[in-house]
Amino acid sequence: MEAPCSPPTAGKFVVVGGGIAGVTCAEQLAINFPSEDILLITASPVIKAVTNFKQVSKVLEEFDVEEQPSTMLENRFPNIKVIESGVKQLKSKEHCVLTEDGNQHIYKKLCLCAGAKPKLICEGNPYVLGIRDTDSAQEFQKQLTKAKRIMIIGNGGIALELVYEIEGCEVIWVIKDKAIGNTFFDAGAAEFLTSKLIDEKPEAKIAQKRTRYTTEGRKKETQARASAGNVGSALGPDWHEGLDLKGTKEFSHKIHIETMCEVKKIYLQEEFRISEKKSLTFPRDHHDQSVTTDKEIWPVYVELTNEKIYGCDFIVSATGVTPNTEPFLCGNNFDVGEDGGLKVDDHMHTSLPDIYAAGDICTAAWHPSPVWQQMRLWTQARQMGWYAAKCMAAASVGESIDMDFSFELFAHVTKFFNYKVVLLGKYNAQGLGSNHELLLRCTKGQEYIKAVLQNGRMMGAVLIGETDLEETFENLILNQMNLSAYGEDLLDPNIDIEDYFD
């Protein structure tokens, strides 16, 4: 027999998730409805707040993500009440959320922002570490201090940043694509960045972008939750700031990339000994193809689909994320996308009445602008959380609103290998078929510029380095001006194209 529940709490608006999408949504609702209690349900004692927000251009934005105790959010917005508990069940027909602490929370409008969890290449293996939230990033730092060699599996943003930031440790990087950073770059941009990996890294300027709060009193509880598979909110931009990512050896970069392969099998030390297979030493030279058997004994061994086997201290699984829908699906008839996310329409509404979703948990199921696509990035989490709050507010007072302008054009600014990286529109010619052309300009070690054109109109761009072209290119994509007359002059470094299009 279940323990009797406490009397239900009621909030006109309830938000689930303490990550960027959830906190942004709750803050916006609190501003719109200062006399209403906004309930924010989160499994973590800390929340992720957007700070130093800067609108760089019409759609490009920059911000930091700061981890804060939830009390700071409640102090800023007295009408936000944070409930620190995981969700046990959603009863959509009763408009009720049951939390793991045994309480019930009644809502009129609900927004699900529970994020995503890392796809692990192997569940339950102590030598496989997924990096998704601050707890797992700090666990990674701890493991790295004892490591001589690690293997990184994956080719997304976290893998790219890790490979560049790690020092004093051999890194074997396994990617299933031909070139690095396939989510973000074509082979040309990948080549431009790869050269940076070979160079010695300059001493980084110590620029602490945000405060990290440790919650000592909760450490055991947090570890218990983490091992139970609980999900922390996603890492924000510059997540590795403040982490000392150094291994045991005295050198900067030692990276070997194994392309076009995946993990075939993982062996623990004893299993590998019994198998009588041979592992390889760390390749010393990209041009030297000679194979040497590794005499060193490692805690874990990885066999790749290209038949190579390497030993290492531990494996980092950075192979993407899965929307964290599990607590909400049972007993509720949500429409779910192919990627496992809750489908939302152009007002962030799910298929169930009064339930919205934003951030990594959702799948954009509307007909998108020709130069926008969903990617599970922190910029989109902020935009979706903000817009979902606007939609919930409008619906609750019977108003209709237009879709937010941020969904007109995909725009993301980040840093990889210490270069500023701006991605605009269909930057990798996604979905354009063969009917497109590329204009390229590259100055080794300085900048890489790619414009994607279709029928003379710019559809996307990649800008690496301090190019100062983001606003001009953003305008050219948005206004769809025919650029055929300019030809390759568009990227001529001797022509100031900003003067053309002011």
Curated annotation (Swiss-Prot):
Q: What is an example of a GO molecular function annotated in this UniProt entry? A: oxidoreductase activity
List the gene name: PYROXD1
User: What biological-process terms (Gene Ontology) are attached?
Assistant: cellular response to oxidative stress
Give the matching PANTHER family. PYRIDINE NUCLEOTIDE-DISULFIDE OXIDOREDUCTASE DOMAIN-CONTAINING, PYRIDINE NUCLEOTIDE-DISULFIDE OXIDOREDUCTASE DOMAIN-CONTAINING PROTEIN 1
Composition bias (Basic and acidic residues) maps to 213-223
Q: Where is this region: Disordered?
A: 208-231
Protein name, per record: Pyridine nucleotide-disulfide oxidoreductase domain-containing protein 1
Under the heading InterPro entries, the entry gives: FAD-bd_OxRdtase, FAD/NAD-bd_sf, FAD/NAD-binding_dom, FAD/NAD-linked_Rdtase_dimer_sf, NAD(P)-bd_dom_sf, Rubredoxin_C
- Cofactor info, note text: Binds 1 FAD per subunit.
Q: Specify the species.
A: Bos taurus
- Key word Oxidoreductase present in the record? yes
Extract the Pfam families matched here: Pyr_redox_2, Rubredoxin_C
